[in-house]
Amino acid sequence: RQELKQRVLDELEKGERKFLIDFSQTGYIDSSGLGVLVSLSKKIREQGGELRLANLNDDLKTLFELTKLDTLFQISDTRERALETF
């Protein structure tokens, strides 16, 4: 979590404004992980950027729906679909 957060913040500092996190290798995320995503999304939006998510499994999709975080993030089924509209 901290590694991801620091990496994104470093890229934001360098001027990057478009971020995509691919969850294809992620089966589970806990509440602190969700908190990191929300925090990153806020910081990125404050700088005029956007954070998108891709390749969430069914359990993660359900988690994002139950926590209403699906309204905060643009979630795509594939990396390609997420990148098409960036």
Give the ranges of each region predicted by the language model.
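Short acidic-hydrophobic, aromatic-tinged amphipathic segments that line or gate anion-handling sites
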Residues: 74-78
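Amphipathic alpha-helical interaction surfaces in cytosolic regulatory modules
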Residues: 1-73
